[in-house]
A protein has these predicted regions:
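Targeting-peptide/extracellular-domain and disordered-appendage signature
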Residues: 1-141
């Protein structure tokens, strides 16, 4: 992979669906649009993931909402990073979401959400903060 910093604000993909400028950015400069992807819906993979770490308490939580075309995956993990490391993860899979989760096109703002009878999870990205909410019934029972 090239070590190239992308600094110009531009669309992520060209008209043919290929990357306009491969590389990395220090800020969000590449603009994503699901409509620009030239692949079948079942091959489009979108996700939102957060890892929240408390160094003071040696614990962490990881939260994922993903729409991977042919499969959806929602998971929550609790990690104890202390003297006796331990983790527990619960995952819900769904067949063929194919864009129905309507994940935001930008990490700057928007709401990512998933809800069913066992899990209510949403990530709210606002102007000055992000709110991560997770109500996972019977988590680790």
């Amino acid at each position: 992979m090239r070590n190239h910093e992308v600094t110009k604000v531009q669309k992520l993909l060209k008209e043919d669906g290929s990357l306009r400028e491969p590389g990395w950015s220090k800020q969000l400069v590449q603009q994503y649009s699901r409509d620009d992807i030239k692949a079948p819906k079942f091959r489009i993979k979108e996700w939102d993931y957060y890892l929240v770490v408390s160094e003071e308490h040696d614990i962490a939580g990881a939260f994922t909402i993903s729409d991977d075309g042919y499969i959806g995956l929602q998971s929550a993990s609790f990690l104890d990073l202390g003297e006796t490391p331990w983790e527990h993860t619960e995952t819900i899979l769904n067949a063929f979401p194919m864009g129905k989760l309507k994940l935001p096109t930008s990490s700057v703002s928007g709401v990512t959400k998933y809800q069913d009878k066992r899990l209510d999870m949403h990530f709210d990205a606002g102007k000055d903060k992000r709110v991560i909410f997770c109500d996972y019934k019977n988590f680790h029972e």
